[in-house]
């Protein structure tokens, strides 16, 4: 747990939120938000159409907004290339997002 700008953050790495009990453990910390850097190699279309909804549902178990960020590989033909994307998940919803398959910056106000 750390604070920045008066906001208390917890951090989850990649598959942490899929580990049984980990989302609830993070919720018990009482953070204002969870930072969730990942490496997801789903094809961009698959992420944008369906998978992000599963991640939003899983993130809701943390009990606070979850800030998801996935790196953007410039060579999409590379094996296991990450397609980028970022989102703010809260309450099982996608509050805002930068779609996978595009480079960009997502600004989120907490």
Residue ranges, per PLM feature:
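CN hydrolase (nitrilase-like) catalytic-core segments centered on the catalytic cysteine
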Residues: 18-105
